[in-house]
């Protein structure tokens, strides 16, 4: 169950356990009645990356695994190449997991807040970047919707302050309010944005 409901003309409430809380003051703008506000952490799984110690060359020499930093991220685009790679030892001792797969959504949440990119290669990434995996998606429609709206949502009002505050942790990200339209509306929004972008580029 998604624990956040929006009644834009009356009030907005959130159920936390058995308690119902009025969060009308937290809602940044009105949305259509068929949409709802959701906490980011209720609709996606997030994974924060890591940086192997720079002083330990064993983690960087003979690197064969792609490692993404913010400078590698293509704003509003696809990451097709990286500047650095990490070794098998780094994978086994630091990351201890498979790389983030090609096609995944990444977002920076430190320094350059809200930059989104799609991975064009399997890769690991640093701790200023999160991998975002929707709990439910169809043909990457929700992924693409988040790809386009997160730069705006994460840099607007209280959201920006929450992410860039002194306490940077999963809680700040989990509490981001995301306007969630029905799936077909998400698809229409993505299609319209891509059409506008294509006209701007050329």
What are these regions, as identified by a protein language model?
Residues 112-115:
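Short, charged beta-turn/beta-strand-edge "cap" motif at the junction between a beta-strand
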Residues 21-51, 180-191, 196-202:
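Non-catalytic DNA-recognition/assembly elements of restriction-modification systems
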Residues 1-19:
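Extended, domain-scale alpha-helical bundle/helix-rich regions
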Residues 14-15, 53-61, 82, 160-163:
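Short coil/turn segments at secondary-structure boundaries
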Residues 107-108:
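A generic structural signal for residues embedded in beta-strands
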Residues 20-26, 41-57, 71-102:
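Sequence-specific dsDNA recognition surfaces
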Residues 40-45, 74-81, 96-102, 118-124, ...:
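Basic, amphipathic alpha-helical recognition segments used for DNA target recognition
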Residues 68:
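ATP-grasp fold ATP-binding core
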